């Protein structure tokens, strides 16, 4: 269960199935969903919550290259909503089976909404549709829950506060428009 929590936090362990070793028996009852983006996210929490022992080694042994125009770096498409679907399922699973991970599951659930919203707003010509409005509504209605979550970073909390005023301000904040500029004195 602790390993599942680390995956949900996303600092030391990624949700990706690559760079991990598994016993064959684990996959007798679990299958990756077909036709979904972020298919790893659909099963990794259930998988790790169900194992008796997990070993973590943070030494780099696998080097992942982010290609421009890969699935994770491409412009927004409706299939990106699969990320929210995956972490909604994880959140429900955690609530029923390992409530001690609620903080981590909430963090990742909201992270998924931010991830998709960021992709939407960074896609030129994106039209604010029903999915956009639903994501913004979810984040706004959980404003205080997100602010109280100790895993959510300061910059994300500031961006969320901007979203409360308008998506235009949120977009300015996440695009780095307000980066601090240091002046040299002397």
Predicted regions mapped to residue ranges:
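Donor-binding/catalytic cores of nucleotide-activated saccharide
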Residues: 1-55, 65-78
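Short alpha-helical segments used as structural interaction elements across diverse proteins
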Residues: 17, 105, 153-154
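Catalytic-loop motifs flanking and including active-site residues across diverse enzymes
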Residues: 43, 86, 109
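A structural signal for short, well-ordered beta-strand segments and their strand-loop junctions
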Residues: 55-57, 104
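Catalytic core of nucleotide-sugar-dependent glycosyltransferases
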Residues: 60-68, 74-101, 113-145
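All-alpha amphipathic helical-bundle segments outside canonical DNA-binding/catalytic cores
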Residues: 101-108
């Amino acid at each position: 269960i602790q390993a599942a929590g680390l995956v949900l936090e996303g600092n030391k362990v990624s949700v990706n199935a690559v760079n991990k070793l598994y016993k064959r028996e684990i996959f007798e009852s679990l299958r990756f969903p077909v036709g979904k983006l972020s298919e790893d996210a659909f099963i990794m929490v259930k998988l790790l919550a169900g194992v008796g022992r997990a070993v973590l080694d943070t030494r780099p042994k696998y080097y992942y290259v982010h290609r421009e125009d890969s699935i994770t770096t491409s412009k927004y498409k409706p299939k990106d909503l699969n990320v929210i679907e995956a972490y909604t399922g994880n959140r429900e699973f955690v609530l029923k089976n390992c409530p001690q991970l609620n903080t981590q599951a909430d963090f990742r659930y909201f992270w998924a909404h931010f991830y998709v919203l960021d992709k939407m707003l960074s896609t030129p010509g994106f039209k604010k549709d029903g999915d956009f409005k639903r994501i913004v509504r979810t984040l706004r209605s959980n404003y205080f829950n997100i602010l109280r979550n100790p895993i959510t970073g300061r910059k994300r909390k500031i961006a969320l506060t901007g979203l409360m005023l308008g998506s235009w301000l949120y977009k300015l904040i996440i695009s780095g428009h307000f980066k601090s500029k240091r002046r040299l004195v002397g």
